[in-house]
């Protein structure tokens, strides 16, 4: 028998072992409930009284439903005592993230997911909160007032944001984590997970959320940190903990929270001379590469230490064409980038979102990495990467000539002048500037030179003075535009809409939510319906003037419509909605929350007639 066949069996067994271990760690949230419950029974002396405190300040977050110049529906509402709890319902005084469900993943603007994302990393958004006193946490309570169940991970940081001296080391520890689970009730609840004990005091807590299973926007009211000033001593009950639980939990946390000692793994991958590679070298190179494509980045690091042949495969730049480093944000630093550098010379998709904050990545370290690895980059994700400055964007513009997609979402610390460098990226097809400080002059320059743009997000860009001028430039230069996000743009009028509608006939998605200066009486919405027949998603959220005439025009002209949000209008009747639903056979999402003519009875009747459509109607208790 050929030696290749037993070798295939061996390799298959190895692959099975890897998958089995990953499957075990994927259920760690279920396995560790008992473990963490025991840990929470820490013995404290009577003198070590528990401190209970609400969040003092919200210091960072990835998105929110509200405006940058308001308190309604913003993350800043998480600071302080509860505003709403124990009441349930949709209240402006709560913290709300920008998305829910899978609707945004089904839109034309949705990006393809990265390969090799660890199965235990499913966070979509986050918020970081500080507290007055550093304590050893004994409990973290989250007051959820509407559609609970989004929080999937709670972390603590060793750094004290209020200390005048920067710490020598910054550590993040997972206090609790779980896979997304569906909570059937929409009522308020006090979420009290059993948290793990950590060996440092903290006053910086991070919540990570996944809203994919939610029926509507989750609303958070407050976060309560319980803790003690002195380090507690575990009781003897902890001897009941299963050692297998500890091993699996440690493995999962390294994969889920960061590439723990990634540089050590790479540096130790220099192997001595072994007797041979068994029969591995009898297999086709491409077959081994294909199998290794299923491993996560930490798995590759471990496998590289087994033999020289597999080390060669694990370090092959072809394994790093798509590189997602976001799951390892808590550990990724300059040293990690340095060791990855030689392996990433062919990288095309790179995700550094959430990474590098609090000094983990320096401007020099990022620049060195891109100078070696930027030439083939096509897609670069940098959402919430607060280490970025003007020099970084200049390096991107110089080192990434083939870049087609750039995401700077919530990089709100970037200075306005930094955005001028984006205009040099003439091949851009996707640009996300949500919650940035881009100014009008820089944006006009970008639009002038980046005429290949197909997807553009300008949501909550508060530094832009005149959105009509921007809309006019978009209509004149961006003829290939397919999706446009103008969420909460403060001053676009019917003139800007006219320029958009005439200049961008390929538009499939348009978000005009919370744009108060648009009035239906000017005919702007009927113009959109006439000139943009390819529309699949249209958000007119909180526009009080949307009326039956607008809905009728959409029904007649935009039959491909899949998502429509008309929250807050007083002038749309059930009859016009029925006509819309009869004409738009692909409609799957219709938000009629706070539409005064659409009561619960009307929603029930429409649901009965069109059961495939998710009709959303929020409420306030």
Curated annotation (Swiss-Prot):
Q: Which domain of life is it from?
A: Eukaryota
Q: Report, as the record phrases it, the tissue specificity of this protein.
A: Expressed in heart, kidney, liver, lung, pancreas, and placenta, but not in skeletal muscle.
Residue ranges annotated for the F-box domain, each copy included: 277-332
Keywords for this protein: Cytoplasm, Disease variant, Leucine-rich repeat, Membrane, Methylation, Mitochondrion, Mitochondrion outer membrane, Nucleus, Primary mitochondrial disease, Repeat, Ubl conjugation pathway
Under PANTHER family, the record lists:
F-BOX_LRR-REPEAT PROTEIN 4 (PTHR13318:SF152), PARTNER OF PAIRED, ISOFORM B-RELATED (PTHR13318)
Entry GO MF terms: ubiquitin-like ligase-substrate adaptor activity
LRR repeats (start-end): 376-397, 402-421, 427-448, 452-474, 480-501, 504-524, 532-558, 559-583, 584-609
**UniProt xrefs under CDD domains:** F-box_FBXL4
Q: In the record, what disease is this protein associated with?
A: Mitochondrial DNA depletion syndrome 13: An autosomal recessive disorder characterized by early infantile onset of encephalopathy, hypotonia, lactic acidosis, and severe global developmental delay. Cells derived from patient tissues show defects in mitochondrial oxidative phosphorylation and decreased mtDNA content.
Q: Which GO terms describe its biological process?
A: autophagy of mitochondrion; negative regulation of mitophagy; SCF-dependent proteasomal ubiquitin-dependent protein catabolic process; ubiquitin-dependent protein catabolic process
Gene name linked to the record: FBXL4
Query: Could you give the subunit structure recorded for this chain?
Result: Part of a SCF (SKP1-CUL1-F-box) protein ligase complex. Interacts with VCP. Interacts with PPTC7; this interaction promotes destruction of BNIP3 and NIX and mitophagy suppression.
Q: What is this protein called?
A: F-box/LRR-repeat protein 4
Residues with the modification Asymmetric dimethylarginine, per the entry, are 28
Q: Which InterPro entries match?
A: F-box-like_dom_sf, F-box_dom, Leu-rich_rpt_Cys-con_subtyp, LRR_dom_sf
> What is this protein's function per UniProt?
Substrate-recognition component of the mitochondria-localized SCF-FBXL4 ubiquitin E3 ligase complex that plays a role in the restriction of mitophagy by controlling the degradation of BNIP3 and NIX mitophagy receptors. Rescues also mitochondrial injury through reverting hyperactivation of DRP1-mediated mitochondrial fission.
């Amino acid at each position: 028998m050929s030696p290749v066949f037993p070798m295939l069996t061996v390799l298959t067994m190895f692959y099975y072992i890897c998958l089995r271990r990953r499957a075990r760690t994927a259920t760690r949230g279920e396995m560790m409930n008992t473990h963490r419950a025991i840990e929470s029974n820490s013995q404290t002396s009577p003198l070590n009284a528990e401190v209970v405190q609400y969040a003092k300040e919200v210091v960072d977050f990835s998105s929110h439903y509200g405006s940058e110049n308001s308190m309604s529906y913003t993350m800043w509402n998480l600071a302080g005592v509860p505003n709403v709890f124990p009441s349930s319902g949709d209240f402006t005084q709560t913290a709300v993230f920008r998305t829910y469900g899978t609707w945004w993943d089904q839109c034309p603007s949705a990006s393809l997911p990265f390969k090799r994302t660890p199965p235990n990393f499913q966070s979509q958004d986050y918020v970081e909160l500080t507290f007055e006193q550093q304590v050893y946490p004994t409990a973290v309570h989250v007051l959820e007032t509407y559609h609970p169940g989004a929080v999937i991970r709670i972390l603590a940081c060793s750094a004290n944001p209020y200390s005048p001296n920067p710490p020598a080391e910054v550590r993040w520890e997972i206090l609790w984590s779980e896979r997304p689970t569906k909570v059937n009730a929409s009522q308020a609840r006090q979420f009290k997970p059993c948290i793990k004990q950590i060996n440092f005091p903290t006053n910086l807590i991070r919540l990570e959320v996944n809203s994919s299973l939610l029926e509507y926007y989750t609303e958070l009211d407050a976060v309560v940190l319980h803790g003690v000033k002195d380090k507690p001593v575990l009781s003897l009950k902890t001897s009941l903990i299963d050692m297998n639980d500890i091993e699996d939990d440690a493995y999962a946390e390294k994969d889920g929270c960061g590439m723990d000692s990634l540089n050590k793994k790479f540096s130790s991958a220099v192997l001595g001379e072994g007797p041979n590679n068994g029969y591995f070298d009898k297999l086709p190179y491409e077959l081994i590469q294909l199998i290794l494509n299923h491993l996560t980045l930490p798995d590759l690091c471990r496998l590289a230490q087994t033999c020289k042949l597999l080390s060669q495969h694990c370090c092959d730049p072809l394994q790093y064409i798509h590189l997602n480093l976001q799951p390892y944000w808590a550990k990724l630093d300059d040293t990690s980038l340095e060791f990855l550098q030689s392996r990433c010379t062919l990288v095309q998709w790179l995700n550094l979102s959430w990474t590098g904050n609090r000094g983990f990545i320096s401007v020099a370290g990022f620049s060195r990495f891109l100078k070696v690895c930027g030439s083939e980059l096509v897609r670069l994700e940098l959402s919430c990467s607060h280490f970025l400055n003007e020099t970084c964007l200049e390096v991107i513009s110089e080192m990434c000539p083939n870049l087609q997609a750039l995401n700077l979402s919530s990089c709100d610390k970037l200075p306005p002048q930094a955005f001028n460098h984006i205009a040099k990226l003439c091949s851009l097809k996707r640009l996300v500037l949500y919650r940035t400080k881009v100014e009008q002059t820089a944006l006009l320059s970008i639009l002038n030179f980046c005429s290949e743009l197909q997807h553009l997000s300008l949501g909550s860009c508060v530094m832009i003075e005149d959105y009509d001028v921007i809309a006019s430039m978009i209509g004149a230069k961006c003829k290939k535009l397919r999706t446009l996000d103008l969420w909460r743009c403060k001053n676009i009028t019917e003139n800007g809409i006219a320029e958009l509608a005439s200049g961008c006939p390929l538009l499939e998605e348009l978000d005009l939510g919370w744009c108060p200066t648009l009035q239906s009486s000017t005919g702007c919405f009927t113009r959109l319906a006439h000139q943009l027949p390819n529309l699949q998603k249209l958000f007119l959220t909180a526009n009080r003037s949307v009326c039956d005439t607008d809905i009728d025009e959409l029904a007649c002209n935009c039959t491909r419509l899949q998502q429509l949000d008309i929250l807050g209008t007083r002038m749309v009747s059930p009859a016009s909605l029925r006509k819309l639903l009869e004409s738009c056979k692909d409609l799957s999402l219709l938000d009629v929350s706070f539409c005064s003519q659409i009561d619960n009875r009307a929603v029930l009747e429409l649901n009965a007639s069109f059961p495939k459509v998710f009709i959303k109607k929020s409420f306030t208790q």
